[in-house]
């Protein structure tokens, strides 16, 4: 494992050298016992000189055996020699993301990829044969013809990617041609999922989220008086409006307030003898906290009012100092994932991540490393169940994203996981599914 940690750091370093600008990288190979540059040159149809041009740190020992687990950059082929074909007993995941791109896109893609690598390493510890191949996704202006050709020759067991919407169509076609699953990790706007059963979306489309969230909302709150408070940002208005429409269709009364409501406005909207649920349609922290503090202040003496608050996924990013307020208002945050910074499993993962890559995870929500790791767990579990289409994902100890895929009509699959994070007196919320 130590050697993997070392070479994964070199992976990023090597990508940044000027030599790579001259000889482009096509993929990354994780060495197995006994491999040499000579054997890799034969396997991938490239010259040793080309291998050394993208792996300059190996130039002093070209004939020496490569350490098991070492990541070797594989350059683009200058000939038509066939690339390495995955053995039948190997479950191979091809990751097509912009791993070398500067800025947020590259950083997030790289961290996701690293998390998936860690899941693969965990799988190997169980004696299973898995392989992760990295293919650098080109920019939107370059197209993915070379990437598609590589995938058709490699014949992976599953593909993860791409990032850019301009590449969805081509990647959808190659997944269909190979009859393998295409896991799109970031975007929810992939129209091909409606017709291609090979596609899996980690982020469900808005229409699916609306239905999933309504099912969960109605199970908990449909009999309570709903009071919607409009925020200045209104980033969650589509989902909230869907709930309101369904409630009105069922004959339920819904009250609506603007963000500058007075105490009397709020008390008039709340039902004095019935449970109430206050729903905000935004996620901007400043706006939300301003409203929640007003709600707490205005109802503090109104002991006859029973109140719960419903919020949204981005509220998870609120700092710990605000969790007490969320608990006092019986806040339920709607989400498809949950990052628990206090979890021993999460802490151990992030410590291992730092040891491997000499970097701390990006402070984002959701966490990219955990997302990649959870995706890997799902994929490798699906391998054992022999089908991504039939995989249940049960009994997997996910770090952050509970993946539960459901079929979308005659098309592909979308992540149908949905939960409420209920904040109370505890330092961590209860999960309600």
Segment roles from a protein language model:
Residues 359-369, 373-432:
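Segments of small-molecule ligand-sensing domains
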Residues 155-164, 183-185, 225-231, 274-291, ...:
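Periplasmic-binding protein-like
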Residues 21-48:
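Primarily a LysM-type cell-wall glycan-binding module
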Residues 1-28, 430-433:
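Bacterial Sec-dependent N-terminal signal peptides
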Residues 109-111, 127-190:
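Beta-alpha junction/loop-to-helix N-cap segments that form part of ligand/metal-binding clefts
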Residues 60-63, 80-150:
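N-terminal extracellular/periplasmic Venus flytrap/periplasmic-binding protein-like
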Residues 160-162, 167-229, 233-243, 318-319:
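Extracytoplasmic ligand/sensor domains, especially the bilobed periplasmic-binding protein
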Residues 295-369:
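Extracellular/periplasmic periplasmic-binding protein-like sensory domains
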